[in-house]
């Protein structure tokens, strides 16, 4: 075993994913520095395990968190100081690839050709560099653009159980931002199932978001730190994905989409790491640094003069308790919420975005304009009235309603169906060509429905269409039989 020099130390203790390393006097590495050690239990490569300095214990000892398995490490092994934080490859060479927390490819397609690397720990853009203009981020998805518009450079919370269409919605957003804005997307799989990560990769290949034959034509990068990884990897993988997105925003001046699935697992991993480091837990057993860690991640996701990173974050709510410190801390940073409803999937409305539960900070006449705001509120009012009447309809039937209420119900059912939309990424399953609907067309379509311009058309004409003209055409075809 090599004798330690000024840039290397020796392992003195290994407790699970926590490794203590002793350095010669005066050679202690800074906090967040990446150290490397050869772990023969992982594979035959040298320096194959990265550990990150988290604490200075005194007596020239650094306490570190491992980014991979520590099985196979023994006391006395030599640890090399890399002199820099964990850095990941960036640039167009990473498009279409699956990377892990330290930027190594895990898709068995050879090494990443990128020559540039970005550190995963970076300061948030300064106030001077940030873009203060509040503008909506058009997605081309009617229900989102009308009722819960996304803020460019904002953070959106995505709520929904299993099988309600989170993945398909994410892929449609990736597709639309690439085709309409020339932007790329980065997907961070944080502490979720490996099987789901694999499914997503293959679905992206099928839908054309990742081009397997020519990776340079891909629109997305996948960065995974899944459930089976040590907590160090799960606590850092979101930062690795963010560094890749920051490169495209700052150096290539692109609009980026950053998906984090799941932001709760980021907090959960931080809690595990905190306990292993011996910190005294805070409320409900979470780490005392919960707000700081969340803030350091979220403040880097913003709009600058170069471009914007708009983030969509899936949020798991433990035991459906919205006051739990983990989701509650994430809520403080959100600009909009998109809630997916199982009831809508049961009646075949896709995307199953709940029009009454989803919210947005920028649905304000000063931001989106008076007409957009007015139409959105009228749509919600109509749907809310329909919801209130559903009990009466279930007990007494439609005939017992007043004429006004019958009209409201008819319009609400048309609105509900018009909120559905065929997706490009689902084309090969449904046979319906996908539709991107411009915001102006969305507003006009819903305005005409709530004003009663299309009261004579059957409600099925509004199902799975793009703009209102398409619904009118569909009605003509239905009438012609």
From Swiss-Prot:
It holds the Pfam family ATP-synt_VA_C. ATP binds at residues 160-167. It is found in: Cell inner membrane. SUPFAM superfamilies: C-terminal domain of alpha and beta subunits of F1 ATP synthase, N-terminal domain of alpha and beta subunits of F1 ATP synthase, P-loop containing nucleoside triphosphate hydrolases. It is a peripheral membrane protein. Its EC number is 7.1.2.2. It catalyses: ATP + H2O + 4 H(+)(in) = ADP + phosphate + 5 H(+)(out). GO terms for cellular component: plasma membrane; proton-transporting ATP synthase complex. InterPro entries: AAA+_ATPase, ATP-synt_VA_C, ATP_synth_F1_bsu, ATPase_a/bsu_AS, ATPase_alpha/beta_chains, ATPase_F1/V1/A1_a/bsu_N, ATPase_F1/V1/A1_a/bsu_N_sf, ATPase_F1/V1/A1_a/bsu_nucl-bd. Keywords: ATP synthesis, ATP-binding, Cell inner membrane, Cell membrane, CF(1), Hydrogen ion transport, Ion transport, Membrane, Nucleotide-binding, Translocase, Transport. Belongs to the ATPase alpha/beta chains family. Produces ATP from ADP in the presence of a proton gradient across the membrane. The catalytic sites are hosted primarily by the beta subunits. F-type ATPases have 2 components, CF(1) - the catalytic core - and CF(0) - the membrane proton channel. CF(1) has five subunits: alpha(3), beta(3), gamma(1), delta(1), epsilon(1). CF(0) has three main subunits: a(1), b(2) and c(9-12). The alpha and beta chains form an alternating ring which encloses part of the gamma chain. CF(1) is attached to CF(0) by a central stalk formed by the gamma and epsilon chains, while a peripheral stalk is formed by the delta and b chains. HAMAP family: ATP_synth_beta_bact. This is ATP synthase subunit beta.
